[in-house]
Amino acid sequence: MNKIIYRKTTKADMKILMKLRLEMLREVNGLSGEYEYDENFIFESRRYFESGEQTTVIASDGETLVGCASLSYTWIMPTFSHPTGNRAHLMNVYTRADYRRRGISKKMVEILIGEAKGNGVTEISLDATEMGIPLYESLGFKASDSCMVMDLEG
């Protein structure tokens, strides 16, 4: 194993990032190895990554992409507890199975937390898997009972 290199993605990384994200979505959602994106999903993902309203970090071992993590920015009306209205949602934190338990996800999230602070973000939310909860707690994230969600698709 080489030294792991971390960097923010560019538009040129879209193809490799989508490939790793597909691997993650198959694993997290229990999809078969044959599952592929549909055209609309690819279009919307490309539009999202090119919008500039997110920061994605990737981790590489030489030429091999081994992990990714994204921070999606949201701007809401300012509140007393969040006077800038700048918030973010952490998502798609993923490290390939043979690279887990080496601190790669933690490092990617730390980079994104620093990026968020630099952009004036006052709150980061996330949806955690059972496997990810200890990682997020170690970084200072806390469970919240104050969030409610309405699914407009269902």
Can you say where each PLM-predicted feature lies in the sequence?
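A short beta-loop-alpha structural element at the N-terminal edge
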Residues: I5-K19
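Conserved acetyl-CoA pyrophosphate-binding loop and the N-cap/start of the following alpha-helix
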Residues: Y99, G103-I111
